[in-house]
Structure formats: structure tokens, C-alpha cells
Amino acid sequence: MDSVEKGAATSVSNPRGRPSRGRPPKLQRNSRGGQGRGVEKPPHLAALILARGGSKGIPLKNIKHLAGVPLIGWVLRAALDSGAFQSVWVSTDHDEIENVAKQFGAQVHRRSSEVSKDSSTSLDAIIEFLNYHNEVDIVGNIQATSPCLHPTDLQKVAEMIREEGYDSVFSVVRRHQFRWSEIQKGVREVTEPLNLNPAKRPRRQDWDGELYENGSFYFAKRHLIEMGYLQGGKMAYYEMRAEHSVDIDVDIDWPIAEQRVLRYGYFGKEKLKEIKLLVCNIDGCLTNGHIYVSGDQKEIISYDVKDAIGISLLKKSGIEVRLISERACSKQTLSSLKLDCKMEVSVSDKLAVVDEWRKEMGLCWKEVAYLGNEVSDEECLKRVGLSGAPADACSTAQKAVGYICKCNGGRGAIREFAEHIFLLMEKVNNSCQK
């Protein structure tokens, strides 16, 4: 199958029948240049993320939301934005993972059941992929569970392979940890130091530490993989920053990784702008979408006090908050909530109203955030600089946003999105200071 460049339509490769368990067939490598030309094309470097659906530690962890983004989305964003690859692929056996991969712009290789077992290795899946992609010369196997990966890391490794002639490069992190031998009853009754002299314990600043694989990626040329290696030949490591070295394996890793990715993760090519306006849909974001009617036929709605506090905090930080609804909500009822927010109801074209508000405040779209949950919010969500949706938003809204809340609408989603805005604004301010 021919590869497609980044940004082109996604495609799927589907192994037919059982793949060969041996080495891929040797290719007849003619000149990689065009017909009648002696100039060779650069080797085809493909990013490959392995993401089977049968994870035992955390079910479907590859698409579980981490900081509002499917886990696999963090590394796909970094790989696609790096510009280092001729193609970016996800190898999976699961429909939901395939759909998420396509949404982010990756191509999909449907792996066979033979390499989707608990006993299958990464090498098995990579060899199967190469069996169906003769155009690929180098594979960058990127781990979906490393969400703090940045495009610059991948660009530098691609350069090491292409320009410096390395056959394989893998990621490491430097650690300053003293290691001791394990005590085993009947074998070793006392422990011994493995990498230090206890009589001369070095200070951290006086010790270079040691290099450990962090599992973020393994790049290798095709001929090595065909021989059964991901590390070999002219080999080198790439040292990643400690704060970017995150690996998720079990549930306990998740909250730690979430905090790390919010502070050190890669959020895309577009430079973040300071948010000046947040627009929230009323029904399903401010409220849970339920409407109660009193005995005298008056409309009653409820909202979460946490969301009111979130709105107050946003306003205190200088961010205008406005409310919008396509329904003919009672302004009197909304006013009784004492949120002190400008609002528009019975809106048939939300994008037009938000655009008017934006122009009124002299803002560009990148300075506007939007929290929506319905199909009618889709265009606004796609247009603004920062978009979010409650956990129970419709699928159309969720597909259009950059952040999906853990909280449902009317149950803390606004407060959660406010905290997300504050964290991103902190990143903006820090980058400006640098």
C-alpha cells in the first residue's frame, strides 16, 4: 500500500489471512529515485504506534482520556506535528481505537489476531506491519503510554538515523538512584550496593547518575527488525528530559501522568493565546439538561455550586463568561442564579452570536474558549482557540473538542474546564517570561 503524506486522508491496511511468522520477503531494492533519475529518495521513515484493545492493566487504556485527550492522541499529535515521518500508523485490532486514530489523522493497520494475543510481542506486531508495507525502510515504534513526548524529540532522533547513520536509536532518561542487591532467603541473606560505595556516598550534584530506558520509543532500520532486533547495529540512545519521561502501565500511574502532561505535555503547533472570553452552553453544561416544572407552571433548573465558583474565579482573573442557549430559557429564572453573566437565549445560530461577542470585545478567535455539549455547538467548538465538552456531551461535540471533562454537565464541568484554562494560561505566561 502506498503511504500518504501527513494531513492526507487516512487509510487502512488489512492483513488478509494469516501473516507469515518468518521474516518478511527480501525486497528487490532498485534505486528509490523516479524513473530515469539517479537521485535517490530519502528512506521512508514510518511512525508506528501499537495499540491493541486487550490491555489487562487498564481496559482500553490507549483511548482512555488523559487530561481530556485520548491517551494515544498525545503521541499521535507529537508524531504528526514533528514532520519527521513519511507516514504515521496505528496498529490495532479494535474498532474504537481505529476510529480515534483516524480522528487524529493517522493511518490504520488492522493487525491480525495472531499478533494481538497477551503473549504477542511488540516485535511480532512490527514484523507483521512490515510484511504489508514494503515501502517502509525505518520504523519509529512509539509507545502510546508516553504522553509527554514532544515533536522536537522525534525530529532529533530522525536526524540521528538519517544524517548520522545510526541503525537504531532508543529513548532513555537519567536517574540518580542507588541500587542494592535483592535479599533472597537461603541464597543471599544480606544486601550489597550495586552502584555506590556507602562509605563515600556521592551528592546528587557530584554524580552523573545512570541511563535507563524509559520506553517512549524505539527506532530501527528494516534489516535489523527482519533479523529480530529493535536495538542493534550502529546503536545510540536519545536522552529525554526527566519531566517528559512518563509511562503509564497501571491505574496508580494515571493521576500522576495527568498532572505531568498538563504541565509538560505538547498541546499542538498553534501557540496558546491568553483566553479573554469563555462561552458556555446553558442546557447540558451549566445545567444537567433537566427541566422541572412547578405547580404554577414555572420552569425550575438546577446547577452545581462548584460551577458558580468556577465562573466567579474566571471573572476575577479577567476572563469574561457568557452563556448561550438555542432554547427559549426563562431569563428571569437564569437571573435568579445570580451568576452576573451576559446571556443570549433562543439562538438559532450560535456561531454568529459568539462572533458578534468576539468582535465587540476586540478579540481574535484564539482568545475565545467554548464549552459545549450539543450538535448546535459544533461550529463554535471547531472555531475557538480552546474547546471543551462535559463527559456526557453528545459524540459530535466530543469529537470537535480539545478537552473532554471528567465531570458531567451541571455537575462540575464548568469548574473543571476553568481549572484547565488556568493551567494553560500559566503555560502561556511562563513561555512569555522565557
Swiss-Prot record:
Gene Ontology molecular functions: N-acylneuraminate cytidylyltransferase activity
Record: residues binding substrate: 52, 62, 111, 120, 122, 143
Entry EC no(s): 2.7.7.43
Modification sites for N-acetylmethionine: 1
Motif BC3 motif boundaries: 269-276
Catalytic activity: an N-acylneuraminate + CTP = a CMP-N-acyl-beta-neuraminate + diphosphate
Subcellular location: Nucleus
GO biological process: N-acetylneuraminate metabolic process
Family statement: Belongs to the CMP-NeuNAc synthase family.
Function: Catalyzes the activation of N-acetylneuraminic acid (NeuNAc) to cytidine 5'-monophosphate N-acetylneuraminic acid (CMP-NeuNAc), a substrate required for the addition of sialic acid. Has some activity toward NeuNAc, N-glycolylneuraminic acid (Neu5Gc) or 2-keto-3-deoxy-D-glycero-D-galacto-nononic acid (KDN).
Domain comment quoted from the record: The BC2 (basic cluster 2) motif is necessary and sufficient for the nuclear localization and contains the catalytic active site. The localization in the nucleus is however not required for the enzyme activity.
The protein's name in its UniProt record: N-acylneuraminate cytidylyltransferase
Organism: Pongo abelii
Biological classification of the source: Eukaryota, Metazoa, Chordata, Craniata, Vertebrata
